[in-house]
Amino acid sequence: MTDSTNSQPKPESFEYLSKAQQQSEDVASQWDQDNQQWWNWYMTLAENEHDQNGRAVKPAPLSLQAPVEIDESTLAQIQDALSVPYKLSADSIEQFGRDGYIKLKNVIDPEHLRLLRQRINSILIDALGTESGLAFRSDEMMWLHDELVRHFVLSKRIAQIASELLGVQAVRLYHDNALSKEPGCGRTPWHYDYHHFPIDSLNVCTAWIPLQTIPSEMGPLAFAAGIDTYKLVKDLPFNKFDSSYDKQLGQIFADNHVPVDDGRFDLGEISFHHTLSFHTAGANRTNESRMALATTYFEDGARLVSSPTMISGEFHKFMPAIEPGDIINSEYNPVCYPNTD
């Protein structure tokens, strides 16, 4: 007689979870692998359309570009441009407070973003190789070793917007994050960052900076409108093994007629979303990588939560030597606005 429990196929997520994390349904333990493996796991939690064979569409091979050298004069121009204050309107601040997100046009010079895209692509290739099986490539803390990335991540212009949207006097950097959704990669699951970031504060927001125009078929970041929308689903249990949590979230938003902004991004347009803002991203159905740089800022004085979970990924690398309950002020969390440089 066959034991039917042994014949059940394991969830796709098991490929990326450690044995210890496979054996428990909760998320209380901390993540015990690197952040690329975290993304490999996390992307399995999205509800996706499948091909006729019942499998998620596999990513196409990467299209590689030669790295581009940037001279000191161009770097200085980029740094200067990213230091110019941005005139944020009262209407934009009001929308952010109401909807939990804002998309702002013409924040960054498109040519500067093209250079950044080439640089980040080179960084990802150096870090991860050219393996076509990676549907979603990521890297963090790039600002520590790349001058061009550092100008963007520590930009006074971008951090000023974050500070004014949050209504706080000063913001620090949590971390940078290169996000490359490859051709054929599926959806990013619905989530809100308060569930992810181990920061004991609501004054947290993320700038999402597309590195190319993102039409709807490329999977732009999409937002469930309403700063209080999270209340509809705050008691919904998270499932770390399959897409049921993501599927239920989408259904609840639809049943409650929550508006979803899934419009395109022009090059130079960036978004900011609050830590309580639910967001997702569609599949990349083009033949190009959908690349973005995300930088997260938090109010100066915020502390590390008492019990970080696996959903926070490899958070220790973003705030070395910071213990639960400590103020987050490591050398990797500089004050980005106001700054004295």
Task: Give names to the regions the model predicted.
Residues 2-39, 44, 229-278, 282-341:
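Conserved double-stranded beta-helix
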Residues 191, 198-216, 264-265, 272, ...:
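Short, conserved beta-strand element in jelly-roll/cupin
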Residues 174, 203, 217-219, 261, ...:
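Residues that flank catalytic or metal-binding motifs in active/ligand-binding sites
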Residues 168, 183-186, 214-216, 229, ...:
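Short, charged/polar surface micro-motifs in flexible loops or helix N-caps
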Residues 2-99, 105-190, 196-199, 236, ...:
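Non-heme Fe(II)-dependent double-stranded beta-helix
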Residues 144, 224, 273:
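A conserved hydrophobic position in a structured secondary element of the catalytic/binding core
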Residues 215-235:
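Core FKBP-type peptidyl-prolyl cis-trans isomerase
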